[in-house]
């Protein structure tokens, strides 16, 4: 994920000007916008997969939980953090930040800090036991913490995980729990290895070795992901530009294909369609593939200016996905709109391809991570290197379609205002 050599970075004045334009347009672009400053930037962000609870002070709001981490660069103690996010329920009156007449506004509150050794690169909750968090840091070990057993503030000066998962020789970012096989955790790192653990297995002195180590990549492994329909299939991607599909039943590669000319930073399997997956690459594109024919992409999404570091399918809409990159933009795409005719006016062409639904420009630095909220459709959280945490939902008028066809004029005006932030 190295920065592209010779690429000119935008100046501070340009960044501030773009942010100012975005901020002025915020009331027109969003139905929800929470911006929360963090003490330290977080490289990771994950919605806890548990049922939201009603907010005690007002049942028209609900409380969701987020997992975050700190990235202090050695300047201070690092922590894994659990936050409460208070947002309006779908039945609450729409409006920026909830109902204007209500004294309760959406907010983020850090509720728990867990001491870790090293900066938190990636943290993911186990689907079958959401309080159990797999944590990759700047060290080679993967930690498991059950935050339900820990107090809100650290009671010890040492890192005390429930399990230490061994097998790697270097740090990394790839981490994925199986939604089918309880306790199965994948990890990919800079040592070119993929480790698989069954954390329900008996450990000796809270240390667990992998049940299998997969090797085949020729460079750093950037990401690993489980197939969303087949419990035995997972994928990996890395700096060797290779997309690899693995099968647990044989512990062998099923496919190994060079699908980009530059590093692949992320992959995501579609949660609805068993054949479709997406990759994010340093070549500035997001590519869509059919598992039955990986030699050529189904479609390439091009709008980012610079490396693309992440891509995630929307868990609530089959044709919607989002991507983020070094251009400080988080873009939402609807591939159902690929091939739609654009209005033949200059503004429409400036807005990008018809499948580009929305471009979020609320961060002043590279976006480190983002996550869709499965319980609240169209709600996304994102964190960036400028210490900002944002929870947001684009205006309904942007994604809503009329029964017969798109509301072309409304969508065009909203998207044009949205793109003015660029």
Go through each PLM region and give its residues.
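Hydrophobic alpha-helical hairpins/lids featuring a short glycine-rich hinge
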Residues: 122-148
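Long, low-complexity, intrinsically disordered N-terminal extensions of eukaryotic proteins, enriched
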Residues: 1-2, 249
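Structural core positions within WD40/WD-like beta-propeller blades
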Residues: 67, 133-134, 185-186, 235, ...
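Per-blade loop-tip surfaces of WD-repeat and WD-like beta-propellers in eukaryotic adaptors/scaffolds
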Residues: 86-90, 101-105, 138-162, 169, ...
């Amino acid at each position: 994920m190295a920065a592209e050599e010779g690429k000119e970075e935008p100046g501070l004045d340009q960044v501030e000007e773009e942010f100012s334009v975005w901020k002025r347009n915020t009331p027109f672009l969003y139905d929800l916008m929470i911006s929360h400053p963090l003490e330290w930037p977080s490289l990771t962000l994950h919605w806890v997969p548990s049922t939201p609870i009603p907010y005690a002070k007002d049942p028209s709001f609900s409380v969701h939980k987020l997992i975050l981490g700190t990235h202090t660069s050695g300047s201070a103690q690092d922590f894994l953090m659990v936050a409460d996010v208070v947002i309006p329920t779908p039945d609450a009156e729409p409006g920026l930040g909830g109902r204007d007449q209500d004294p309760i506004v959406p907010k983020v509150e850090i509720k728990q800090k867990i001491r870790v050794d090293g900066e938190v690169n990636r943290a993911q909750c186990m689907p079958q036991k959401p309080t159990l968090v797999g944590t990759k840091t700047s060290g080679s070990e993967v930690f498991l913490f059950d935050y339900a057993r820990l107090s809100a503030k650290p009671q010890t000066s040492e890192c005390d995980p429930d399990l230490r998962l061994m097998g790697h020789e270097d740090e990394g970012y790839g981490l994925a729990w199986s939604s089918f096989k309880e306790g199965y955790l994948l990890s990919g790192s800079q040592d070119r290895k993929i480790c698989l653990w069954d954390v329900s297995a008996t450990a000796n002195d809270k240390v667990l070795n992998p049940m299998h180590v997969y090797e085949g990549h020729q460079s750093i492994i950037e990401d690993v992901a489980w197939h969303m329909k087949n419990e035995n299939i997972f994928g990996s991607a890395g700096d060797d530009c290779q997309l690899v599909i693995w099968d647990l039943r044989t512990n062998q590669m099923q496919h190994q294909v060079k699908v980009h000319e530059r590093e692949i930073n992320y992959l995501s399997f579609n949660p609805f369609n068993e054949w479709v997956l997406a990759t994010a690459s340093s070549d500035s594109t997001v590519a869509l593939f059919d598992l039955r024919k990986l030699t050529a992409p189904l479609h390439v999404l091009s709008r980012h200016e610079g490396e693309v570091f992440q891509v995630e399918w929307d868990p609530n809409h089959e044709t919607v996905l989002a991507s983020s990159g070094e251009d400080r933009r988080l873009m939402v795409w609807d591939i159902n709109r690929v091939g739609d005719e654009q209005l033949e006016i200059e503004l429409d062409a400036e807005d990008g391809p018809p499948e580009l639904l929305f471009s979020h420009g609320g961060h002043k630095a590279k976006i480190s991570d983002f996550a869709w909220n499965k319980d609240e459709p169209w709600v996304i959280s994102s964190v960036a290197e400028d210490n900002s945490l944002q929870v947001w939902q684009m205006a309904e008028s942007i994604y809503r379609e009329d029964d017969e066809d798109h509301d072309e004029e409304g969508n065009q005006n909203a998207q044009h205002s949205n793109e003015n932030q660029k």
